[in-house]
Amino acid sequence: MALWDIKGKMAGMPLYELFGGKVREGIPVYRHVDGRDINEICENIQMYQEMGITHLRCQCGGYGGLPYGQTPETAPEGAHDGLYLDSKKYIRDTIQLFEQIRAKIGYDMQLVHDVHERIAPADAVALAKGLEPFDLFFLEDPVPLEQLSWLRNLRQQTSIPIAQGELFNNPYEWRTVIAEQLIDFIRVHISQVGGITPARKLQIF
C-alpha cells in the first residue's frame, strides 16, 4: 500500500485516477449500532436515521455482541477465565433482537448482523433460517474459515444474503466461494489479503 501511495504522489494523482478514474459517485456504508438492550439499540438506530445512515450492523450488548449468549456458568471445569458462548442462547437472542427491531422501526433500514465465525456451521444454518423473516441486508461471517464448504449448505437451505471474507489471506480461500456463487458480498481487509494489488485482482476475479 505504501508503494502505491508513493507512485500516486510521484504522479501527482489520487489512486483512483491511476486505476482509470472513478466509476461511481458514492457507495453505501454501514455503521455499527449496539446497546445494552433492545430499547437502547432502537434509540441509537433512530439517531443514525436522522444522520442519513441507511445501513446498520446490529449487535446487542456491545461491540461483537457480548454478553449476548454469554453463559460463563457453563464454562468447563478448570477452563481459563473468559467468556463462553452458548450457541443456542445466542441464536434465540439474535432472532429475538431482529424481531423486536423490525417491530419497532419497520423495514426501511438495511440491517446487518455479524456472527464473527463464533458458532458451529449447523448452528449458522439454523440462525440464518431464523433471521429470514427480518430481511437482513446480509449475514456476515456465519462459518469459520476452516469450514467454508458449509457455505454450500447455507446457500441450499436459506435465502438470506451471505457476506464472508474478513479473515481471507490468499486466493485459494476466495476462488471457490466466488466461482460457485456461495456468497453475495465479499468482505476483506485490504491489509489482510496482501495490499492494494491483490485486492484489485480479487475485484476482477
What are these regions (language model features)?
Residues 1-13:
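Metal- or metallocofactor-binding catalytic centers and their adjacent structured scaffolds
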Residues 10, 28, 32, 205:
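Ligand-binding pocket scaffold of soluble enzyme catalytic domains
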Residues 10-22:
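Short, flexible active-site-proximal loops enriched in glycine and acidic residues
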Residues 5-6, 17, 47, 100, ...:
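Alpha-helical scaffold segments in soluble metabolic enzymes
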